[in-house]
Amino acid sequence: IGNAVTTPRQEKVVVEESYPERIPSESYYAPSGLRITNIRFIDDNRNHTIDAEENCKLVFDIVNEGDVSAYNITPVIEEVTEMKHLAISPSAQISYLPQGDRVRYTATIAGGKRLKTGEAVFRVYTTESNGAVSEAHEFSLPTAKRYK
């Protein structure tokens, strides 16, 4: 009780702070000067379908349209729909791409023995050592199971 007279009352202070809204799809790094062009799909039997037990190629050009050279470029090819029995070759890193130059990149996509008929959706983009990410391209390709 003796303390009640000498102790000041604690007042609650509410501080409202505002933070910028984060949008998860945006890159928080410098925009990339890289652009993916001329995407082509080539399969062994030329039917424009990924068949079971077939090796296919995905070929595209990476163009440096930025103001500076790009370093440690990693082309990324993702299968978005998580279709099973599809194998994509590991990415090969491109160590240096001068401003205004282009490089042609080839990835292998293999259909496994147990591949099902359906549609696979792929996303292709590049990342750089500074964290910059290029614009992503999405496209779909039909898949077909093996017929006995």
Annotate each PLM feature:
Residues I1-V14:
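Short, low-complexity, glycine-enriched hydrophobic/amphipathic alpha-helices that associate
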Residues V63-K84:
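Short acidic, flexible loop segments centered on an aromatic residue
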Residues V14-A52, E82, F139-K148:
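Low-complexity, acidic Ser/Thr/Pro/Gly-rich terminal tails and inter-domain linkers that flank the onset
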Residues Q93-V103:
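Short proline/glycine- and polar residue-rich coil/turn motifs
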Residues A52-D67:
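Short beta-strand elements of extracellular/lumenal beta-sandwich folds
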Residues N45, V63-S69, K113, N130:
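Short, acidic/polar linear motifs in exposed loop/turn regions
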Residues Y19-I23, A87-P90, T106, A110-K148:
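Terminal connector regions
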